[in-house]
Structure formats: structure tokens, C-alpha cells
Amino acid sequence: MTADLGTTADLSTAPATGGLLAADAPSVVQSIDWLAVAPPTLTALAALAVLVADLFLPAHRKRLLGYAALTALAAALALLIPLRAGDRATFCVTTGTRACSYTADHFTLVIQALVLGGALLTVLLSLDDTRKLPAGEYWFLLLASAAGAALLPASRDLATLVVALEVASLPAFALVGIKRGDRRSSEAALKFFLSSVVATAVMLLGVSFVYATTGTLHLTEIATRLDDVPPVLDTLARTGVALTLVGFAFKTAAAPFHFWVPDTYVGAPLPIAAYLSVVGKAVGFSGLILVTVVAFPSYADVWGPALAVLAALTMTAGNVAALRQNAARARSAVRLLAWSSVAQAGYLLVPIAAAAYSSDDQIGSTVAYALMYAVVNLGAFAVAAVVARTHPGNRLTDYRGLYATRPLAALALGFFLLCLAGLPPGIIGLFAKVTVFSAAVDAGLGWLAVVMAVNVVIALYYYLQWTAILFRAPEGAPETTGTATAPTASAPPRRFRAPTPLTTAIVLTATAGILLSGVPQTVLRFASVSLF
């Protein structure tokens, strides 16, 4: 009986002991911070909602889908406000290390604001440009791509990073080729797709090499384990780092991975060209920053010199090609903006390369420059969309005398071009370039600063040439003299009233550009603080 009682007592205490051990053991269930993931999640849900709603809306109501997309992106932007402290992370490993797959730090929030704001302005450019396009598919693809682009800067492991990159890219292929029956659009989509697939394949090979070397996908853990790589695996690690950079170099349109840019921008619908020039570039640069500065700091001797050379090649290739544009060629205005975006990518690469030689704080210069570039480049595309409604060829010669017919649009475009050139009154463009110069000089990259200075001078020619065209007398117009002249048979061209969404996009970008020029420290402060 005593033995039975003792046995019973032992059995009765066993579950309690097991319960205590279970209570002490860390949970393997990951908690989710829904507020942290709200911006990309809302955008993705809106994409699905728009696609389903398209099935039930009659043709004359399809325009509502565009306003739904606009509302969703505005709401996603508003959801960034409660995250402004930049101290949230989720999908974290619960055992051992505290590595997380999603982090909403200051870098994430700034890039998400850029991406979602760029997508919102793209919607404004598209509202009156989608009548001949499948509305449901168009808005679904745009929102899906924006969701992937918003996810990427928050990704802190290679798996999430690659998935976000592809979610942002795959809808973009379809958007470029969405103009059915347009040979140029189909050709552009095919070039974009094939180039991207090759770059992604090379990048995935690099990711597999990095994983084989470190045994982890979390960026912070990769950085820790690459600090102490066995000599036998050093070559494999270096190869993995180099190949991983290739995929992101393609997304940033860095030379020699830039040849898809002009044909893709020219063949795509104009709003999608604007989207790729800003949001697509933000995706590439944010991914490049994460893998270099966060994951691969131990191999700065590999990616630092490589990115410095790529920066010099990219800005030179873009500016030289822009100089050679024929003003009378069809869509030469869009083609010049495409080559200009390649050159701007070279400037954006400079601080990332500089981070290999000095400190991670140099990354802030890239972020500050990207914010300036996003505002003024989207504004330039908005004015190009206005001109394209009366001149479908969108040649540079079509802009001659724009001030005579559309003075506000001409003034806005002139301001945007001067910002890109870095000349007053585009003060924000000037200061942004100065921060990039400073990053190169502080890192001891004097030769790269000299190359950039030469390229800035080269770019002045085509930016100022386009600006001058805006204020010249229109073709065939009589020269202005001091005496009155009799009216001629050729009346001035009839004024065209721009759609309200296009006008809104121009006003928003021009206002933002003027405010940033008046208070440049709004974005330049990112160049002097750590964003991680």
C-alpha cells in the first residue's frame, strides 16, 4: 500500500514537473506584429479586392477601380505614421538568436514611403490612360507590384528578400506588355522579362552559395558567420557575394545591366515607365543596400570596389547615351528620361560604394538622393504625359514653345529638369549631389568624385537644352517685334485642358520639389544619421 501510494505520488508530480519544464522552454510559435506588416499587407489585399470587383462592375464603372487603388495606397501611407518610431520587428526566431525576418526600422519606413508614394502618383498618371487597357488586370498588377516593393525594404532574410523582389518584378513584366496588339510593348516586355530572369537566376545561385557557406538565411546571422569563414569556404563565400549583387545591379539599371531600360520605358505605357524609373529603382537599391551593408560587411573588399566601378560606368554610359538622342525621333523625350535615369542610378551607387570604405552612415546619402530623384522624376513624367495627349509621338521637338501654350506645365518641367541637373532654383538637386560628392570624398574615393563631377557637367548640356526648348517660339510662329503685326493665317494651337488627375500629380510633385528646395534638410538629414 505504501509502495502504491509512493508510486502514485511520483506519478502525480511528474506532470507538474513536465509542466514547469514546458513553461520554461521558449515557444516555437512566432508572434506577428500586424501593425508592422500593415502597409504591404493592405496593399496586397487591395490588389485582390480590385481583381474580384472587376468581375462584377459594368464597363462604365471600371474607373472606380482606379480610385479604389488610390484610396488603398493613401491608407497604406497613413499606416506608416504609427510606425514612425522605427522600433518594430516581427517573424523573429524564438530560439537562440533574435534574428527577425521583417523589421520596420527607419530605413524601411523611408523606402516604403517612397514606394507607396510613387505608386500613388502612378495611379494619378494612369486614371485617364487606362480606357483602352483591361482595367481590373492593370490595377491588380500595379498594386501587387507595389506590395512586393513595400515588403522588400523590411525583409531581413534572403528568402523573404528574393520573394519580395519577384513579387515586385513579375507584375511589372505584364504591365510593360499590357497594351494588346502593340508590337513595341510586347517587345519591351520580352526584353525586360528575359534580362530579369537571367539576373534572378544568377542571384539565386549566389544566394545558394552564401547559404552553403553560412547555414542561415537571416541577414544579421549571415554577417556574424561571414566574420569567421573557414579558409576552404572563402572562395565559395566571395563568389556567392559577387553573384548575389548581380541581380540587384540589374534592378538598379547599373551598367552593364542597363540595356533593357530605354526600350522598356519607350514600349511601356507612360505611367508604367514612370513607375519603373522610381519604384523599380527603389526596389533594386534597397535590396542592394541590405545585402551589402547588413549581410556582407565582412566582404566589403569585394563589393566596395565593384560598386565604385559600376557607379562610374553607369553614370558615364547614361549621360553619353542621353547626349546622343535625336530630338526629332519618336518618343525621344521618354528615351532621354530613360537614359537620364541610368545616369542617376550611377550617382545613387556612389554612397553605397563609399560605405565599404568608411561607415554605414553613408547609406543615408543614397536615401536622401533617392527621395529627391523620385519627386522630380515623377513630375517630369507627369508633364510628359500631358504633352503626349496632344503629341502622341512625344518627341523633344514637341516641347518647343510649351510655355506659350501651357505655361505652368513648362515652368514645372523646367524646374524638374533643373533639379535633376543640380542647378538653382532646383536647390534640393544641388544639395543632394553635394551629399553624394561628400560621401565619395570622405571615403577616400577621390577618383570617383572626379568622374561624377565630369558627368554632372555633361548632363548639364541635355538638361539645359531641353529646358531651353520649352521657352523658344513655337515652330512657324512669327518673331516678336516692337511693332504690332497683322494676324497671320496660322492661329496658335488650341489649348488642351489636362485631366484633373494629371494636373494633381504635377501640382503635388512641383509643390514637394519647391518645399524640399526651401527646406532641404527635410531629406538631407538622412545623410547624417544611421537608418538601421
UniProtKB/Swiss-Prot annotation:
Pfam families: Proton_antipo_M
Assembly notes: NDH-1 is composed of 14 different subunits. Subunits NuoA, H, J, K, L, M, N constitute the membrane sector of the complex.
GO cellular-component term (any): plasma membrane
This protein's encoding gene: nuoN2
GO annotation (BP), single: ATP synthesis coupled electron transport
Residue ranges crossing the lipid bilayer per the database entry: 37-57, 63-83, 107-127, 133-153, 158-178, 192-212, 241-261, 276-296, 302-322, 336-356, 367-387, 411-431, 444-464, 504-524
UniProtKB keywords: Cell membrane, Membrane, NAD, Quinone, Translocase, Transmembrane, Transmembrane helix, Transport
Family matches, as InterPro entries: NADH-Q_OxRdtase_suN/2, ND/Mrp_TM
Protein family according to the UniProt entry: Belongs to the complex I subunit 2 family.
Known function: NDH-1 shuttles electrons from NADH, via FMN and iron-sulfur (Fe-S) centers, to quinones in the respiratory chain. The immediate electron acceptor for the enzyme in this species is believed to be a menaquinone. Couples the redox reaction to proton translocation (for every two electrons transferred, four hydrogen ions are translocated across the cytoplasmic membrane), and thus conserves the redox energy in a proton gradient.
Protein name in UniProt: NADH-quinone oxidoreductase subunit N 2
Species annotation: Streptomyces griseus subsp. griseus (strain JCM 4626 / CBS 651.72 / NBRC 13350 / KCC S-0626 / ISP 5235)
